[in-house]
């Protein structure tokens, strides 16, 4: 996976993620959990958010690599997730979005 463009990643977040997620560290949850500081956080552990058992049991710590895999096809990576988003098929868009999420600490 190449290094992404965080500015473009922010645009992708606003277009495709912001309906269900916030990204400011410590921000409120929406339909989905707040994603501020998600890189390096264990899956299913954002305080105050009710995750599915599938997300909790996955037990991974989010890295660039597994976020890329998840964002490509969320329901394949975590069967039983309640995330309805179909995924980002373009590797460049995933790299940009991950660069944006990493920049948000």
Swiss-Prot record:
Binds 1 heme c group covalently per subunit. Its main location: mitochondrion. InterPro entries: Cyt_c-like_dom, Cyt_c-like_dom_sf, Cyt_c_1A/1B. GO terms for molecular function: cysteine-type endopeptidase activator activity involved in apoptotic process; electron transfer activity; heme binding; metal ion binding. Heme c binds at residues 17, 20-21, 83. Keywords: Electron transport, Heme, Iron, Metal-binding, Mitochondrion, Respiratory chain, Transport. It is found in: Mitochondrion intermembrane space. Belongs to the cytochrome c family. There are two cytochrome C genes in Drosophila: Cyt-c-d (distal) and Cyt-c-p (proximal). This is Cytochrome c-1. The gene is Cyt-c-d.
